[in-house]
Amino acid sequence: MAMVVSSWRDPQDDVAGGNPGGPNPAAQAARGGGGGAGEQQQQQAGSGAPHTPQTPGQPGAPATPGTAGDKGQGPPGSGQSQQHIECVVCGDKSSGKHYGQFTCEGCKSFFKRSVRRNLTYTCRANRNCPIDQHHRNQCQYCRLKKCLKVGMRREAVQRGRMPPTQPNPGQYALTNGDPLNGHCYLSGYISLLLRAEPYPTSRYGSQCMQPNNIMGIENICELAARLLFSAVEWARNIPFFPDLQITDQVSLLRLTWSELFVLNAAQCSMPLHVAPLLAAAGLHASPMSADRVVAFMDHIRIFQEQVEKLKALHVDSAEYSCLKAIVLFTSDACGLSDAAHIESLQEKSQCALEEYVRSQYPNQPSRFGKLLLRLPSLRTVSSSVIEQLFFVRLVGKTPIETLIRDMLLSGSSFNWPYMSIQCS
């Protein structure tokens, strides 16, 4: 009777998924044959040596299933039953499960470095570069994007390894597949919307909400510029939007920037008492007829009313993020390549808001409806009035739509030639 002795296994072998002693023909044959007596007799007959049990650490000791097999890989050339698993990012040989997915050492290290250092990359092409063994180092932006899309977890880098059975809301939100309904998906989607905010709300609120803090015209114009920048930065980092064609991104933001600006102004409690002062200064620089002055001041009043009505609802940060996503993903924009897809993204955002409101405000059954009813009114605020009120001193006659296009194409909201604002 053949006697099978389990070989000693170094813990490092489980981590690396390999055998430090290197592949051994006898060990490979024993592993591939499952330790059957018939194959062992054939080995002995072929070698002319009797079978002798080997001790731990002896070269050529038969490996037990679970060393390389636990990582989904085995030594090259073996006829093993273990399946070779590729890196889900680049297709290279996986070294195990890292941050929720099977990846190679290179992609594991790249993802960990990118998350820990909070690195930001820029794609020089169309944000759809091929990521494989030969091209993975050519575009860091697309490589990180693919890491997130296949489900690698940022939280696992920051907090240590997470159990594989734990759901990953970010993976659901970043997958352009069939719509996933359910609280887990929706709450994960909202968390990604919130994470995309470039600045904490308190950064504005701490300055704007202090009653004794008097802000000058220049400060208000700078704050307005920051609100516009934050809208573009937020959109560029939320789920689904970066995957759209750049022409669609430009079309959506050019149509909705003023609505996003009003939402941001309400969210940061922008001091609206200075609006008449801004108007007076603007009218002094560019005189208008009496009729135009009346119309202009009426539009300022509408802007103030919309902001105050939003503030009266005490909208929280998650609700603001959902409202902005509903506004942004509108199929009303001209020239969209796939209007139906944009509309489906708007429905996703609306469902997320409804689920959130029902779970967080169960005693306010009409809250969801009140929030949605505020959105059509945002379009009553004239974008040209916002432009003339807050931005004419900074950018002159350059249209805001042109600035938005340049921001998206340049990959940075703060490196543009029209003005210089320090956003430290």
Swiss-Prot record:
Residues 1-82 are annotated as: Disordered. A zinc finger (NR C4-type) spans 87-107, 123-147. SMART domains: HOLI, ZnF_C4. Residues 84-159 bind DNA. InterPro entries: NHR-like_dom_sf, Nucl_hrmn_rcpt_lig-bd, Nuclear_hormone_rcpt_NR2, Nuclear_hrmn_rcpt, Znf_hrmn_rcpt, Znf_NHR/GATA. SUPFAM superfamilies: Glucocorticoid receptor-like (DNA-binding domain), Nuclear receptor ligand-binding domain. Keywords: Activator, DNA-binding, Metal-binding, Nucleus, Receptor, Transcription, Transcription regulation, Zinc, Zinc-finger. One of its GO terms (cellular component) is cytosol. Residues 39-68 have a biased composition (Low complexity). One of its GO terms (molecular function) is nuclear receptor activity. It is found in: Nucleus. Its main location: nucleus. GO terms for biological process: cell differentiation; negative regulation of transcription by RNA polymerase II; nervous system development. The keyword DNA-binding applies. Residues 185-411 form the NR LBD domain. The keyword Transcription regulation applies. Belongs to the nuclear hormone receptor family. NR2 subfamily. Binds DNA as dimer; homodimer and probable heterodimer with NR2F6. Interacts with GTF2B; this interaction is direct. Interacts with COPS2. Coup (chicken ovalbumin upstream promoter) transcription factor binds to the ovalbumin promoter and, in conjunction with another protein (S300-II) stimulates initiation of transcription. Binds to both direct repeats and palindromes of the 5'-AGGTCA-3' motif. Represses transcriptional activity of LHCG. This is COUP transcription factor 1. It comes from Bos taurus (Bovine).
